[in-house]
Amino acid sequence: RVLEPGXEDPDVGEPAGEYEHHLLEX
């Protein structure tokens, strides 16, 4: 599941740290 910046949902089950890391890699 791809979340949009500023709209990340803590219920997604994935740590926000990894989500932000993907944005940076990204």
Curated annotation (Swiss-Prot):
Disordered: annotated span: 1-26
TM region positions: none
Record keyword Zinc present: no
A GO CC annotation given for this chain: extracellular region
Composition-biased stretches (Acidic residues): 1-12
Keyword set includes Secreted: yes
Further comment found in the protein's record: The mature peptide does not contain cysteine residues.
Protein name, UniProt field: Conotoxin reg6(gamma)
Species for this entry: Conus regius
